[in-house]
UniProtKB/Swiss-Prot annotation:
It comes from Nocardia farcinica (strain IFM 10152). One of its GO terms (cellular component) is cytosol. One of its GO terms (molecular function) is ATP binding. Its EC number is 6.3.5.2. Pathway: Purine metabolism; GMP biosynthesis; GMP from XMP (L-Gln route): step 1/1. This is GMP synthase [glutamine-hydrolyzing]. It holds the Pfam family NAD_synthase.
Amino acid sequence: MAETQRPVLVVDFGAQYAQLIARRVREASVYSEVVPHTATVEEIAAKKPLAVILSGGPASVYAEGAPQLDPRLFDLNLPVFGICYGFQAMAQALGGTVAHTGTREYGRTELNIDGGVLHGGLPTIQPVWMSHGDAVTDAPEGFEVTGTTAGAPVAAFEDRARRLAGVQYHPEVLHSPHGQQVLSRFLHELAGIPASWTPSNIADVLVEQVRAQVGDGHAICGLSGGVDSAVAAALVQRAIGDRLTCVFVDHGLLRAGEREQVQQDFVASTGAKLVTVDAVDKFLGELKGVTDPEEKRKIIGREFIRSFEDAVRQIVDEQGAAEGKQPEVEFLVQGTLYPDVVESGGGTGTANIKSHHNVGGLPEDLEFELVEPLRLLFKDEVRAVGRELGLPEEIVARQPFPGPGLAIRIIGEVTADRLATLRQADAIAREELTAAGLDRQIWQCPVVLLADVRSVGVQGDGRTYGHPIVLRPVSSEDAMTADWTRLPYEVLERISTRITNEVAEVNRVVLDVTSKPPGTIEWE
């Protein structure tokens, strides 16, 4: 992206919210990247940023070993916006005063506004989300104080002439209801950055990048049925046409209709070449008698690699035979997203890609150069690009689904009968959530079969002894944390009634109301 988009750099001072800040910048139609606080001023300048945002962080600016802000950053004459710790570090570097006031503010706090570019016209008293012990007590010379709280005499300031500003609170979180507006005003009004980061522009840039990387070569992409691999494949197909071959391994652990969705909807909307590997019997055979969730995952991962490897070998050999020369499928497409890049230490998302990367346990003689067209995108951007490329909503809006599939939503041994039971219950839950218009209000809704548990019930004139089904609806922005979704009672009632009436082996439906933490989203 660097060739065409100058970024706003989010300097990460160890905040759990650095990625969220980058997302909020992009929601304001401005491209952003995360860089570590160890990045030097020279490294920052080399990226030619349009602006710099200093994130929050857990440290005190006075603590030994706390991340420091190099004052030379301000010699670059860039717009700079400080948040929480970044606000304090900015104030200190420019000659202001940061002190231990003895008053800590955590959680919801009232902010009192006194004009300014960023807050002008907004409610003069507004709720914000705070998380600080130290506070700025005197603003640097040239700054106007535009906000105060009970525990922070300087909670917001601006130096409009130098395009510098900052806030003590967290504008990036939903608990600061005017925060996105404040961030947008910094980007567009104070920094003067145009709103040019849009799905159509993103798609055009990514297609050109793939063309430049692949050239006249051939590529392979493993489709999982999920949105990431589907959008990655659609982008590459748009770029190189029938020189892309997609491989879809059906391990029998998918939800109802997902194989058909890939084979029909994806192919129809993209025109991509698709090879389907039917490995249902192979996977179920290997999973026979296995109840330990970690063992399930290992078996599924191993067998998937073997199945994909066999398909890739066949494609490589056929490609070479068709062209009358040595096989030349040089590229492997993966749906890596920006959070994966940041969390693996890639930081800015511009780390060099190894020219021949041995991926995912493939044998050493199958070496590919990675094509990762989504590596600078967040999940919501991937969906937007998918829509821009014309992928059907059934694929683009698909909820996250684990790689091991329904195997880790069956608590107990995985069998064909148990898969059929869970598949039917899951389909009912999804149908009712869609009918109620709740698909986009939840992150995902795992449906879990307690296959090794039976409960007594009464249906008709007789007693039943069936399995419980667990509904696990959760709301989240990034799956790092999640809250259970408060679904309307009438929707829950319809789901429960239909499952217990239509799924023969189930006589009880229960609701999981555990947040993450302490519970994970998936049961296994």
